[in-house]
């Protein structure tokens, strides 16, 4: 509904390695949003009561990869929700993002890209009710280390993902206009996450680094 809070689920690292970008990103979301925002940081946990406890993450490329497929159930299959990775800065009202209509026959929308069968699942908008009775209950698959990639294949092969404007997931500024900036190249992420052990590189676009620095300073 138009007056409901904007529900945003953010996949992040487990032990505070991304604390700086978490703070800057959350600030940017709340600053730009015209409605109340309900933010959930999804991270690995030892809390057995948590919805995010006990997931098999052996084959995940990040500490949170598979969590995105449980978000509609976490919302009780009601309303709409947004998923994003943590390595982002928001630059446009997320109420506009969550209010995008999910096309008939689609479970969600994501931008087109070169990975994952032609979709980039780092920003997703869900119509949670559409997932009920289509995707099995989380408890039946969260211990399966292959589930994350099975879901990607399922959604791509059955054409269940609609198209999201690329400006809502601009990969290091690969769009002329940026609504949601995604620092996708890990070696150049300006907050220097502790978990990254590869060769650090300077970001090629100083103006994009300044966007992060401004959001962090404001937060």
Feature roles, as predicted:
Residues 67-116, 123-131:
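GT-A fold catalytic core of metal-dependent nucleotide-sugar glycosyltransferases
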Residues 2, 31-36, 74-82:
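Short, solvent-exposed loop/edge-beta patches enriched in aromatic
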Residues 2-14, 18-19, 23-24, 33-35, ...:
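A glycosyltransferase accessory/donor-loop signature
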Residues 59, 110-112, 217-218:
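Carbohydrate-active catalytic/glycan-binding domains of CAZyme proteins
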Residues 37-74:
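Active-site-proximal specificity loops/subdomain of glycosyltransferases
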Residues 6-10, 51-58, 79:
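Glycine-/proline-rich flexible loop or hinge segments
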Residues 119-123, 176-178:
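Short hydrophobic/aromatic beta-strand or adjacent loop that forms the aromatic wall/cage
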